[in-house]
């Protein structure tokens, strides 16, 4: 999955992404025995017994310094979806939607009041998915500057 995602993004933005090294990739991608806890979630989607996609998320606790922060969300538990991927053959078949909805339900059950994620701004697939399909709103911009 990481190889396919890396290849896709390397094609659309070769200066921002690269194809991951294949050696050791499978072992690095396998969830550990403690992948699902009260604060961490890994979901795997299958279609007709075949791997179709995955999602990784975590429950972020309220920040102790939230009263000093300008973002009110930081004072509450938040669901952070840090990885979502589906094989291209399963795009637009509801796999990613079901994964995100399951993660949101998991977060809600644990007290999360908001769900957050990040994605590549230049993606013609993920931006419409998150904004139009799932109802997420843009709230921040991540800036980057090479130092070497």
Model-derived features: positions:
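Conserved GNAT-fold acetyl-CoA-binding loop/helix
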Residues: 3-31
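A short helix-loop-beta-strand connector motif used in the catalytic cores of GNAT acetyltransferases and
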Residues: 27-44, 62, 80, 137
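Conserved beta-strand in the GNAT
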Residues: 44, 50-59, 80, 85
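Conserved acyl-donor/pantetheine-binding loop and adjacent beta-alpha core of acyl/acetyltransferases
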Residues: 56-80
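Conserved acetyl-CoA-binding loop-helix of GNAT-fold acetyltransferases
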Residues: 83-86, 92-105
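Conserved beta-strand-loop-alpha-helix junction that forms the acyl-donor binding cleft
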Residues: 91, 116-127, 144-147
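Conserved GNAT acetyl-CoA-binding A-motif
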Residues: 100, 107-119
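Conserved active-site tyrosine of GNAT-family acetyltransferases
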Residues: 130-131
